[in-house]
């Protein structure tokens, strides 16, 4: 599919904005009508009172009409709000296509971990990050899932399943729009961790033995209440009851209060715990139910999506029906605040019986809550990748090679840069090619960007997304990067020490199952040239011996000798600049060999420093 998404988004945004204008005009008209009803109602009542012919109908009819229009107005406002969400969905999509997306979406800062081997170095989270570019998820579970995929490489089998799912979802724009609109309600109101924990928590009430006890107590309490009523109405002569009968009814009434009251207060602590927990959980499930109901209606073809769709079902029953049952239980629980039910509470065991119903719901459906959340989160994450695929139809899915520790790319570019600014390079590293590229070059020539380009496309590839390349073939890789490091005054860590700690972390990665792709910028920049040369060669040699592949950049041309020392396992490449009419120009193309010039002095002169 190579259709340009821009006209599609533009057309749909126009439709949503037109619908908003139409519905806002209708809402304004409803406001005028409500005002007219109030004015006319007051006038009619005043006239009726003045004429002495007042009837409750004169006031009742305007009140009923006003209330009906209020309800209609609230429903219309909800529709308008959802249309606005849809419009924002397409506005953000167009902003991504125009390269103006940074700062408009969710940055994923809560996932940022300075100890992660590549998250900060490759701009995974934060303003202008990969997460902000990709994420269209509107629930926390969807964001959590997408972040986990970016932070943890999947196996080729899992990646291929995701690729198939993304390819199917990329054409389902209506589904992606609906999930973005419906998920907004669930965004701030649903905590997936606590909700799943509530569903799986041990039972606070024993459904088995309590059920018959509660029904016996309800029957006994009902009989006691009826007996008490009979005693009461006998006292005013409305029923003919013997003294013995009255005494028995009175005793039954008192005993039912004592017995039911004993059990009611004996069970009060676990019952209050059940009711307190379910109030929040039921609210969260209610917010999530529309998202789940929308997914229930969709029919999927690929195995991954079909399996997720099936996982929503529990014994053939969709989550919307199960959540609806819990909603009905909650409505009955909430009605205990009714004055009449407060009087009857102890007699009919209203709260205990419905607390038990909640526990029975949890025993049948509680363990499914995590499955619902997982399925919804995965589909939202897949929809995020599908939106990216839809918006970049020329970006292919990568292929996985059985060759260990290799990456081969044709026209590889940085996905966070606007398409008109991306400069692409070819590269083959690992396998039968050199395992280490020593990248030299002048300042601002593109060395660090090349490292990030390699890393971020590897992350996309192993998450299941398309990559910014004409073609990319790679083996499964564990990425370790040392690009963006800083000192810490509070932690007592210098930049150099922070770098060697990260290098230790990268070296430790080589003990895992996957071969390592290391990306090291300005190798050992915080020490003298002699120590840097010795340390760098030893570390690179150790990485290669452990099957690692990667790139290191440097300004120190002495480090270029590392490639010669490693023979066929390493090679030198460089980026360079051109100076024309006193201006420094970069083409950002990677070339073989060692750079032969520096631009530091020219850069200092360009900002007005006297050199």
Task: Put a short name on every predicted segment.
Residues 260-263, 385, 392, 396-611:
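ATPase nucleotide-binding head domains, primarily ABC-like/P-loop NTPase cores
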Residues 1-444, 449-478, 502:
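Alpha-helical coupling/stalk and coiled-coil linker elements that connect catalytic or binding modules
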